[in-house]
């Protein structure tokens, strides 16, 4: 994960917030940081600004999802004994690890963390890896490791859980168009990019709250 070295000293939420502040800075300081007037062509750099800002919003979400899982697993390993870990995690580790000696003494903690990092980043053979932070992939990752889907509890004022999921799917789709086709989705403007930054900021804060509650209930 290319961002891991940069976010090692930050919490998952701080890492996401830093990336979103980069989006804010980009929108405020870029020469093309005004929408074109109706009927007028966009100025130079307007399309790239929209694309880079939206891609950064998505990156903040993906980085958060990955780092928050590792952060939560680290907390569980530091605070619980093996038999107290979530059943889903114990089942998954038993299936993934082929070396019983890796769990001798206290080395089980580092072995579990290694397995989880492989699941997120991919291993040396290019297997596993968390590719896209879609609703389905996030749910699958967290259910597999923790036996818990934080997304199911996320909603806020005037934003139902279904609407949250729809917006995540749309962000993934828009980011896919930008990254894989190099195109700017037609309806995207500066307000839209700011909207994505606000959405991801709220989403990661709510997700983090769900993980805090999960820790308290384990």
What does each model-found stretch correspond to?
Residues 1-55, 67-70, 78-79, 83-88:
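Charged alpha-helical initiation segments
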Residues 57, 61-62, 171, 175:
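Alpha-helical transition-metal enzyme core signature, strongest for iron centers
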Residues 56-57, 64-159:
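Helix-loop junctions and short alpha-helical segments
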Residues 36, 40, 77-93, 188-191, ...:
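Solvent-exposed, non-transmembrane amphipathic alpha-helical segments
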Residues 21-27, 137-177, 190-218:
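Amphipathic, Lys/Arg-enriched alpha-helical patches that create a basic surface
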């Amino acid at each position: 994960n290319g961002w891991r070295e940069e976010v090692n000293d930050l919490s998952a939420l701080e890492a996401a917030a830093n990336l979103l502040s980069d989006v804010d800075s980009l929108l405020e300081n870029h020469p093309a940081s005004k929408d074109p007037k109706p009927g007028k062509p966009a100025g130079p750099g307007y399309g790239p600004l929209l694309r880079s800002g939206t891609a950064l919003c998505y990156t903040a979400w993906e980085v958060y999802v990955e780092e928050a899982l590792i952060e939560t697993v680290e907390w569980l390993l530091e605070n619980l004994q093996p038999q107290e870990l979530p059943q889903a995690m114990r089942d998954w580790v038993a299936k993934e690890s082929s070396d019983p000696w890796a769990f001798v003494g206290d080395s089980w903690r580092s072995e579990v963390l290694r397995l989880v990092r492989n699941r997120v980043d991919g291993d040396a053979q290019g297997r596993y890896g968390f590719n896209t932070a879609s609703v389905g992939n996030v749910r699958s990752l967290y259910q597999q490791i923790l036996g818990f889907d934080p997304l199911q509890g996320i909603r806020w004022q005037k934003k139902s859980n279904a609407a949250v999921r729809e917006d995540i799917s749309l962000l993934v789709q828009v980011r896919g168009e930008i990254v894989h086709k190099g195109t700017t989705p037609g309806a995207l403007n500066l307000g839209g990019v700011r909207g994505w930054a606000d959405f991801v900021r709220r989403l990661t804060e709510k997700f983090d709250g769900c993980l805090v509650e999960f820790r308290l209930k384990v």
